[in-house]
Every structure is written in C-alpha cells, then in structure tokens.
C-alpha cells in the first residue's frame, strides 16, 4: 500500500525556492524563500508559519525523516532559523547547504542538529546509507512513513566514485 508521488513540477528554477514549494505546496514567495539561500548574505528561511507535508503527515501518525541537502535555512552563524525538526521531521540527517569541502569525505553533515564530523565516502552514498539505516532499523515497521531525500550532487563541485563515473 501507500502513495508514490511521481510527477512533481518545480515551483521555481532554482534550488531553495523549489524545495520550499515541494514541502508546502505553496508559492515559494509565500513560504518565505524568494531566492537561493546564501547563509552568509541573509537570514531567509522557510517560515515556521508554513505547514509542510511532513507536519501534516506527522499529525496523522506518520514517522517522518529528511535526508540530504536542506538548503531552507538553518541555525548556523548564531541565527535562530528553524531546522527540519521544526518543520515536522522526527529524524533528519543532512546539510545546511553543501557537503564541504567536497562530495568526497564530507565534513558538514548534521544528524538531528549535531555535527557528525568527517565521513568517509561520497555524499550521495552516505545519504542513501543513512536513509536505509533509518528505514531498516530506526523506524517502527507498523507505522506509515514519509521519507524525504534530496541529493546534493546536482551542485558543484561534483564528485562520485570511479565505478559510477566510468559508466
């Protein structure tokens, strides 16, 4: 059983606004995200007043988890921006923006708000492994779930295992 969403149309031509539209189902301006979020330049973030799909599903008994790039504002640089937990995700493993310094052996991942430190491997594989661990070990098998997974790889600098690149 369940529902598989297979036909999403981007709400904007860039990263952060599209993510805001995906989570809220509303125009990104209304959700508070009007351009790509550059943490050093402004405090823009997904407004806490917006209801996300994760919040709606959580209220209806779903386990919710986010994996990968968030890029909707985070409490970095002493800011009080909301985290994925503030938008309905029970569990999250992700990035404020990029994996830094590269997709290989990244250092910027957070797990439920706590820095993880350097992880060996490539960010795409790390995110999938974490999501699979959550699916197989951390969630209640009898509970419906919503898993949101956003890869960082569409953004430079691109790095991937040689066996994938060679294909």
What are these regions (language model features)?
Residues 1-167:
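Formylglycine-dependent sulfatase
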């Amino acid at each position: 059983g369940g529902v598989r969403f297979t036909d999403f149309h981007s709400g904007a031509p860039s990263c952060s606004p599209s993510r805001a539209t995906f989570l809220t189902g509303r125009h990104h301006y209304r959700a508070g995200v009007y351009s790509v979020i550059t943490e050093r330049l402004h405090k823009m973030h997904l407004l806490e007043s917006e209801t996300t799909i994760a919040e709606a599903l959580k209220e209806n008994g779903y386990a919710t988890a986010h994996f990968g790039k968030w890029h909707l504002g985070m409490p970095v640089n002493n800011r009080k921006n909301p985290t994925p937990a503030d938008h309905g995700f029970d569990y999250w493993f992700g990035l404020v923006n990029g994996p830094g310094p590269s997709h290989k052996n990244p250092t910027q991942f957070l797990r439920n708000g706590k820095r993880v430190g350097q992880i060996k491997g490539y960010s795409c594989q790390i995110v999938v492994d974490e999501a699979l661990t959550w699916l197989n070990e951390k969630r209640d098998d009898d509970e419906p779930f919503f898993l949101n997974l956003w890869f960082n790889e569409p953004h430079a600098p691109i790095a991937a295992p040689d066996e994938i690149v060679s294909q």
